[in-house]
């Protein structure tokens, strides 16, 4: 990442060092020289001067089922927060940097002929560019290896779609909110409820895109919101209680919802919240933690996609059925959901 930032952007070397995870410029220079046998300034001086705003290039292993990924996000996109436009995804983002909230935007454009995603981020996110790029890789599942996953998905009772990916997130808390509000309702109904949260509690942000004007409300904002105000958005009392318990735990640092967080401990912490069962915890682990073996065994959609008879519709039976799909059961979930959402 550091080498690409030096050659493809005009970020100062000090910011590149921070983005690459180094606390000091001296340590960054030493590590860079040890690996490449020259210092960062030499690399930038010898390369061509990059134009302002040039995109960073993130590679992925083909095949990549872009239609499925983009379709998944398009069906769930929130007005003012995100936009799916052809092969391009745009959305707003709010992060913490040195105890301060930092807001901005990210634009990701698929370039299939190069097996790359070209990413641009707002200047406000420059100090966090390394973190942003890692979040983008998770969001679009760019590190997946189809050579390992597709042979397992070929065992599913549906046609293989090469290059299935897990649709991740830039904000794990947002995904958890979506999943809670998606309990026992359709995708469209869940999106409507989440949109109302954005409309009521979203935070304005400046972007060059007319469609992007707000960031998703923070955990702190929803934790301290008046429950009656949240309920008036059409969210039932049980969901309000679950939502605010989640927000309180995340705001307090008791639950971390990001790739690399401990799966079992996070599942236990989620299931301990009021109104959160195993289905919710598993779907959050699938999207927020990028757990490749997440398995929401009680999901009615999975049972429908698998064509299970009435006497076969129990979690134990479907879990036994899914045993050959380990350790990629989450990819099987996404593949089966795709068929449900896109009937032929």
Language-model segment annotations:
Residues 1-344:
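HhH-family (HhH-GPD) DNA N-glycosylase catalytic core used in base-excision repair
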């Amino acid at each position: 990442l550091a080498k690409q930032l030096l050659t493809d952007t005009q970020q100062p070397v000090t910011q590149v060092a921070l983005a690459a995870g180094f606390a000091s410029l001296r340590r960054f220079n030493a590590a860079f020289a040890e690996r490449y046998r020259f210092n960062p300034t030499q690399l930038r001086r010898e390369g061509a001067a990059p134009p302002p705003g040039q995109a960073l290039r993130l590679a992925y292993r083909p095949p990549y089922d872009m239609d499925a990924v983009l379709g998944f996000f398009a069906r769930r996109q929130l007005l003012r927060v995100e936009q799916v436009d052809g092969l391009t995804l745009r959305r707003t983002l709010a992060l913490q940097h040195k105890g301060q909230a930092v807001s901005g935007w990210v634009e990701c454009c698929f370039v299939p002929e190069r097996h790359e995603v070209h990413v641009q981020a707002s200047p406000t996110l420059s100090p966090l560019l390394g973190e942003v790029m890692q979040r983008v890789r998770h969001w679009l599942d760019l590190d997946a290896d189809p050579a390992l996953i597709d042979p397992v998905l070929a065992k599913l009772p549906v046609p293989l779609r090469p290059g299935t990916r897990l649709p991740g997130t830039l904000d794990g808390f947002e995904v958890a909110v979506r999943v809670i509000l998606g309990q026992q309702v359709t995708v469209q109904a869940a999106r409507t409820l989440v949109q109302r949260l954005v409309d009521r509690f979203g935070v304005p942000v400046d972007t060059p895109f007319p469609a992007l004007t707000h960031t998703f409300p923070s955990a702190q904002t929803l934790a301290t919101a008046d429950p009656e105000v949240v309920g008036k958005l059409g969210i039932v009392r049980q969901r309000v209680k679950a939502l605010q318990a989640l927000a309180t735990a995340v705001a307090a640092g008791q639950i971390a919802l990001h790739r690399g967080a401990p799966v079992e401990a996070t599942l236990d912490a989620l299931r301990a919240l009021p109104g959160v069962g195993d289905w919710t915890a598993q779907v959050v682990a699938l999207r927020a933690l990028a757990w490749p073996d997440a398995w929401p065994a009680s999901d009615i959609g999975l049972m429908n996609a698998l064509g299970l008879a009435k006497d076969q519709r129990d979690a134990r039976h479907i879990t036994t059925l899914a045993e050959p799909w380990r350790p990629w059961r989450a990819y099987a979930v996404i593949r089966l959901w795709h068929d449900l959402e896109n009937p032929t």
